[in-house]
Regions:
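Transmembrane catalytic cores of multi-pass membrane glycosyltransferases
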Residues: 29-87, 91, 140, 189-285
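Membrane-interface alpha helices of multi-pass inner-membrane proteins
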Residues: 174-197
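Membrane-interface helix-boundary motifs at transmembrane edges
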Residues: 6-7, 105-116, 164-172, 208-219, ...
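Membrane-embedded alpha-helical segments of multi-pass membrane proteins
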Residues: 91-100, 143-156, 198-199, 272, ...
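Transmembrane-helix motifs of polytopic, lipid-linked glycan transferases
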Residues: 94-117, 155
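Membrane-interface micro-motifs in multi-pass membrane enzymes
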Residues: 118-164
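Aromatic-anchored segments of alpha-helical transmembrane domains
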Residues: 22-23, 123-131, 183-188, 226-236
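Start-transfer (signal-anchor) and selected internal transmembrane alpha helices
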Residues: 1-25
Length: 285
């Protein structure tokens, strides 16, 4: 038993597994080819011609905001990586997925010792429970939106989690400024991820204020405001208003919310039941 525990906490095994996760995702990305919207995003939304340089992306995104939607950060990455050799995206996307696994591990175990079994378990759970794994984790357009949006959200919330735990965070001025700027990008990234990040950030700040009896940090309040600015920019873009609000109205958002809850029940009910059991056990024991 001691040998197994020692092996489970071995840092070299842990890092080897991290490298293995990266390798698996790199191979899967390498053999995932362009599909569907990838081909339309190869062309500029402004000129309808093939994008040749990075500078072509900026007028394309301006036209995208007017005609499609205001989700510009995610689609900037889509057009950027469609412009670059495909191998670059294979590496970057594998890195982002590995970062997702690591931040989930960090949230669950915080500052505890390395746990190789837990790392593999998190990878397996994400693999099994992520809806449409290929579309959200491998496909270029889909992963730039959903995988990256989820990963960026968890990393952006990390300082708020540290704050709630009374740990030191955001001590440098440059760090705070960059965090505020990143807040606008986070708010403009993906409707669901952006809104969820804003709500969770507010809840963590409220917990810090009323449960820990501490003042609201300036960087925390400022980042919520920049996220809100980015979110409003995305939701009020002419393309968003024309294609989403105008066609479906408020009831469309209500229907989407109901459908999303149905999907959560369908795919994540088992995880929810496990969570309830663990919470009950932690209270009783």
């Amino acid at each position: 038993m001691k040998t197994l525990r020692k092996m489970n906490g071995n840092k070299y095994l842990f890092y080897l597994l991290v490298a293995g996760i990266f390798g698996i995702m790199f191979l899967l990305n390498h053999y995932t080819f362009y599909a569907a919207d990838d081909y339309s995003y190869m062309n500029s939304f402004a000129t309808h011609k093939k994008i040749q340089t990075v500078w072509d992306i900026f007028p394309s995104m301006y036209a995208h905001a007017k005609g499609m939607n205001g989700r510009l950060v995610a689609h900037f990455f889509v057009q950027l990586f469609l412009l670059l050799p495909s191998g670059i995206f294979d590496v970057v996307n594998a890195v982002i997925f590995t970062m997702l696994i690591l931040i989930l591990y960090r949230y669950l175990f915080w500052n505890k010792k390395r746990n190789a079994l837990a790392l593999v378990s998190i990878f397996g759970l994400v693999w099994y429970f992520a809806p449409a794994f290929g579309q959200t984790m491998l496909w270029l357009d889909g992963s730039c939106n959903y995988l990256w949006g989820c990963t960026f959200s968890l990393y952006y919330l990390y300082p708020f989690m540290k704050l709630a735990k009374n740990e030191k965070v955001m001590e440098g001025k440059i760090q705070k400024i960059l965090f505020l700027v990143a807040g606008f990008a986070m708010g403009d990234y993906l409707e669901t991820a952006s809104f969820g990040t804003i709500v969770l950030a507010v809840l963590l700040l409220a917990y810090h204020r009323w449960m820990k009896k501490e003042k609201f940090p300036v960087w925390g309040m400022g980042s919520v405001l920049t996220m809100l600015a980015g979110f409003l920019f995305m939701m009020t873009a002419p393309g968003t208003l024309k294609n989403k609000v105008a066609t479906s109205g408020l009831h469309g958002y209500v229907d989407n919310f109901i459908n999303a809850m149905d999907l959560y029940v369908e795919h994540l009910l088992i995880l929810l039941l496990i969570l309830i059991v663990l919470i009950v056990c932690s209270v009783i024991l």
